[in-house]
Amino acid sequence: MSAESPEPASAEEQKEMEDKVISPEKAEEAKLKARYPHLGQKPGGSDFLRKRLQKGQKYFDSGDYNMAKAKMKNKQLPTAAPDKTEVTGDHIPTPQDLPQRKPSLVASKLAG
C-alpha cells in the first residue's frame, strides 16, 4: 500500500503552468495590442476635451437648460399663502348647502 501519490504542485509551479497555457482570450488580446498599440493608453484625449470635462457639463440640450432655468425661477419666487383655508371632503354637500345658480344670459335651446 505504499503507492506513490502525486504531490500537489507548489504555488510557483502552478503559476508557471498557467503562464504557459494561454487562454484564447489572452492570445487574442495580445494580438490586438500588437496591432493597435495606441489603444492601450489611458483615455485622456486632447487638451480641449480635458478642459471641457474638468468644467463639468452644464446642459445637454435646450430642454435641460429650460428645466434648470425654471428651477431657478421657482426658488426665487415667494410662495403665496392660500386664500381658502377650507378643506374639501369634510362633509357631503346637500342642496341647501350649495349656492344658488346664477341665471344664464343666453337662453337655453332645450328650454322650450
Swiss-Prot record:
Transferase among keywords: no
Q: How does it get modified after it is made?
A: Phosphorylation at Ser-62 by MASTL/GWL during mitosis is essential for interaction with PPP2R2D (PR55-delta) and subsequent inactivation of PP2A.
Which residues are modified to Phosphoserine? Answer: 62, 104
The UniProt keyword set, sorted, is: Acetylation, Cell cycle, Cell division, Cytoplasm, Mitosis, Phosphoprotein, Protein phosphatase inhibitor
Please list the residues that carry the modification N-acetylserine: 2
BP terms from Gene Ontology: cell division; G2/M transition of mitotic cell cycle; mitotic cell cycle; positive regulation of gluconeogenesis
Pfam families of this UniProt entry?
A: Endosulfine
Keyword Phosphoprotein applies: yes
Q: Where is the composition biased (Low complexity)?
A: 1-11
Question: Which InterPro entries does the record cross-reference, listed alphabetically?
Answer: Endosulphine (IPR006760)
> One GO term of the cellular component aspect?
cytoplasm
What ranges does the record list as Basic and acidic residues composition bias? 12-32
Residues crossing the lipid bilayer are: none
- Region spans: Disordered: 1-48, 73-112
Query: Which GO MF term does the entry hold, naming one?
Result: signaling receptor binding
Q: Where in the cell is it found?
A: Cytoplasm
Q: What does this protein do?
A: Protein phosphatase inhibitor that specifically inhibits protein phosphatase 2A (PP2A) during mitosis. Inhibition of PP2A is enhanced when ARPP19 is phosphorylated. When phosphorylated at Ser-62 during mitosis, specifically interacts with PPP2R2D (PR55-delta) and inhibits its activity, leading to inactivation of PP2A, an essential condition to keep cyclin-B1-CDK1 activity high during M phase.
Its quaternary structure? Interacts (when phosphorylated at Ser-62) with PPP2R2D.
For this chain, the family text in UniProt reads:
Belongs to the endosulfine family.
- According to UniProt, the name of this protein is cAMP-regulated phosphoprotein 19
Q: Which organism is it from?
A: Gallus gallus (Chicken)
